[in-house]
């Protein structure tokens, strides 16, 4: 199986919890339909270290200007305060290049406001932290806002800051990370804490369906 790289955009103020479930599931071969198919790589505006909202220092694997869409299976954009300050415009330019090349992107929390400001959500069903939060950007897609934890429309996934599990679920579904049965068991386990779902995940038929 040819390994595919998922790129996680990293920047100062990144909200640690929002992409934790997604990147762990992608990078860890356990229970995957094709174990080891994905690896996660970090991309920064430059290659200087960044510090998350939780105080974790991350050294980006590469800079945005070194990344071409054809090298990637998906771009993940976490939330963080800098989006609301009008930052990360380089990541929005990269997002447009990804979508033009037919490569999916996934944005959560503040990153959705960045997409809204860039006009990317004007014609797509989407969600965010709140309808009013995106409306404040002055974007033209308000009629397509969905009051849901996470929404997938074509090659764009969006989610609320309080929905890291649903965000990961939509990413895993889009990329066929797990079999359908394993994906539902994974979601049930982390959403409810019911250990019975773990048993379903470990069934051989589910692990490699």
Task: Label every model-predicted segment.
Residues 42-54:
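Membrane-interfacial amphipathic helices and adjacent loop/beta segments
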Residues 54-61:
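Short gly/ser/thr-rich secondary-structure transition/capping motifs
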């Amino acid at each position: 199986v040819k390994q595919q790289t998922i790129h996680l955009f990293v920047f100062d103020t990144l909200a640690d919890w929002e992409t934790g479930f997604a990147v762990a599931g992608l990078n860890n071969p356990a229970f995957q339909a094709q174990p080891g198919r994905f690896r996660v790589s970090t991309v920064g505006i430059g290659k200087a270290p960044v510090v998350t909202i939780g105080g974790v220092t991350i050294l980006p694997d590469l800079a945005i200007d070194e990344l071409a869409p054809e090298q990637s299976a998906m771009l993940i954009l976490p939330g963080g305060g800098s989006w609301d300050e009008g930052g990360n415009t380089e990541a929005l330019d990269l997002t447009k290049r990804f979508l033009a090349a037919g490569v999916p992107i996934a944005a959560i929390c503040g990153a959705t406001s960045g997409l809204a400001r860039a006009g990317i959500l004007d014609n797509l069903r989407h969600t965010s932290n709140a309808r009013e939060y995106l409306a404040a950007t002055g974007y033209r897609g308000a009629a397509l806002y969905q009051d849901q934890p996470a929404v997938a429309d074509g090659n764009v996934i969006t989610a609320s800051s309080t929905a890291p599990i649903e965000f990961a679920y939509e990413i895993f579904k889009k990329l066929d990370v797990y079999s359908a049965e394993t994906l539902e068991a994974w979601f049930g386990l982390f959403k409810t804490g019911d250990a019975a779902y773990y048993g379903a995940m470990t069934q051989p038929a589910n692990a490699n369906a």
